[in-house]
């Protein structure tokens, strides 16, 4: 049996799986081949259960394809493989990390071998502010395809802060659950280590604190405070844009925390490299750990969010009513919850049962606005959901037909249904030139005449966006 068996499996899995999935679940595994058994060691029970549930068949299939009837049996363990091994027994991973998920920079200082999580002291500063909202936990975060990887990564960070995913960078549109996950991580860490110094903040508070420190000649105290935390959770990092002094100070804070194995989690409304006005050295560091997108929730997740929110308020929400609301409000979780709060308030005030007709009346102005309001953002979300791809794919440089055709469709719809100019549409699709938009519109127009499927897709999307 080849000693490179696990390396062969890794190479195939890296080709077959999305880069984020491979980096998150497969890369942390260690392997040992002995007595026709391939033992896979996971860093914790969460990773072990996930790999066994999601990838067991993939791995067994690869072992069979490589070894036939002599394929080894799989065994899963939590921990690390034994240190004392012969060279013939050790099997390790040598697959290069995907650049877009984890980037190792030559100038990065080597992490300290001493973990700051071995002996977490009680907070020393009387002005220490956690700001973690105890109401936001993993238990009340509704999981769906759109946020599954982000939740899983956040859960691992909460279980093993300062470990593999440092920094963790979550990005996506407004109201999709990024802030909820930040607080959930903070609560998870403090549940394990009650004395851990976990600080949640909006990026503008970091800027404000630094300005006050400069005004009061207290910059050294500022540095000590932020570099002594065990986990720093910063929301909306894009607001650092064009704030050069703040970026300079955060650059050094970032390096100090990483060297001390202190956890950093950042969120933004866009991919790190697409944040304008932020220094390249910072954007590069943002991608050192794991970068995960949160997409707008799909229909099933929107329904689940409404049902869970209603349950938390001891309100019986009929399934058909949840579906009615979810089908019409597609943009984000915050909008859904706001609509449901209005429905609940109206029901409490009037004493009426919650039916579709009641919801239609209670949300009359909101639904009327949704029916009239067709934006490029809405078109992108609708097209992505229709073709079962991500909004990020529409904005990417990918040219495969499975992405390029929906992108052309979305551009044509934007020209048809909005008042935006071709350059404005191009800019909304990843900064593309207006000639690209014009070509897309002409291509879809041609295909609508030649292909019944394209004609039907266009009609269905027009109907969905206009209804």
Swiss-Prot record:
Keywords: ATP-binding, Cytoplasm, DNA replication, DNA-binding, Lipid-binding, Nucleotide-binding
GO molecular function: ATP binding; ATP hydrolysis activity; DNA replication origin binding; lipid binding
Chain residue ranges for the region called Domain IV, binds dsDNA: 348-467
Xref: NCBIfam families: DnaA
Region Domain I, interacts with DnaA modulators, annotated ranges: 1-90
Subunit structure: Oligomerizes as a right-handed, spiral filament on DNA at oriC.
Gene Ontology, cellular component aspect: cytoplasm; plasma membrane
Job of this protein: Plays an essential role in the initiation and regulation of chromosomal replication. ATP-DnaA binds to the origin of replication (oriC) to initiate formation of the DNA replication initiation complex once per cell cycle. Binds the DnaA box (a 9 base pair repeat at the origin) and separates the double-stranded (ds)DNA. Forms a right-handed helical filament on oriC DNA; dsDNA binds to the exterior of the filament while single-stranded (ss)DNA is stabiized in the filament's interior.
Name recorded for this polypeptide: Chromosomal replication initiator protein DnaA
Pfam families in alphabetical order: Bac_DnaA (PF00308), Bac_DnaA_C (PF08299), DnaA_N (PF11638)
Similarity annotation: Belongs to the DnaA family.
Organism: Shigella boydii serotype 4 (strain Sb227)
């Amino acid at each position: 049996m080849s000693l490179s068996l696990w390396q062969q499996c890794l190479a195939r899995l890296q080709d077959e799986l999305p880069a984020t999935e491979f980096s998150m679940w497969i890369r942390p595994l260690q392997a040992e081949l002995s007595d026709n058994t391939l033992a896979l060691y996971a860093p914790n029970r969460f990773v072990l259960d996930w790999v066994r549930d999601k990838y067991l068949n993939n791995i067994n299939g690869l072992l069979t394809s490589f070894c036939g009837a002599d394929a080894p049996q799989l065994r899963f363990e939590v921990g690390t493989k034994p240190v004392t091994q012969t060279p013939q027994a050790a099997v390790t991973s040598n697959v290069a990390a995907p650049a877009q998920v984890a980037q190792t920079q030559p100038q990065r200082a080597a992490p300290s071998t001493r973990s700051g999580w071995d002996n977490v002291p009680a907070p020393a500063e009387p002005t220490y502010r956690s700001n973690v909202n105890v109401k936001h936990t993993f238990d009340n975060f509704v999981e769906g395809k759109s946020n599954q990887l982000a939740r899983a990564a956040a859960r691992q960070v909460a279980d093993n802060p300062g470990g593999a995913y440092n920094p963790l960078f979550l990005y996506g549109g407004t109201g999709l659950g990024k802030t909820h996950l930040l607080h959930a991580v903070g609560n998870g860490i403090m549940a394990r280590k009650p004395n851990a110094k976990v600080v949640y903040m909006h990026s503008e508070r970091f800027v404000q604190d630094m300005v006050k420190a400069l005004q009061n000649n207290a910059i050294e105290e500022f540095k000590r405070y932020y570099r002594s935390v065990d986990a720093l959770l910063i929301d909306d990092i894009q607001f650092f844009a064009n704030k050069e002094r703040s970026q300079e100070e955060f650059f050094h804070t970032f390096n100090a925390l990483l060297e001390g194995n202190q956890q950093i989690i950042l969120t933004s409304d866009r991919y790190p490299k697409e944040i304008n006005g932020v220094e390249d050295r910072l954007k590069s560091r943002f991608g050192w750990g794991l970068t995960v997108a949160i997409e707008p929730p799909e229909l099933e997740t929107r329904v689940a969010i409404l049902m869970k929110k209603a349950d938390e308020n001891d309100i019986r929400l009929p399934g058909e009513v949840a579906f009615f609301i979810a089908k019409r409000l597609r943009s984000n979780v915050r909008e859904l919850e706001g609509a449901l709060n209005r429905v609940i308030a109206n029901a409490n005030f009037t004493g009426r049962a919650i039916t579709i007709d009641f919801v239609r009346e209670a949300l009359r102005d909101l639904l009327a606005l949704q029916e009239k309001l067709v934006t490029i953002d809405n078109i992108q979300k609708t097209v992505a959901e229709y073709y079962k791809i991500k909004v990020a794919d529409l904005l990417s440089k990918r040219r495969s037909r499975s992405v390029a055709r929906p992108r052309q469709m979305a551009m044509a719809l934007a020209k048809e249904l909005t008042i935006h100019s071709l350059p404005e549409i191009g800019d909304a699709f990843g900064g593309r030139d207006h000639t690209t938009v014009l070509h897309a519109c002409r291509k879809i127009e041609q295909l609508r005449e030649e292909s019944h499927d394209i004609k039907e897709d266009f009609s269905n999307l027009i109907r969905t966006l206009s209804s």
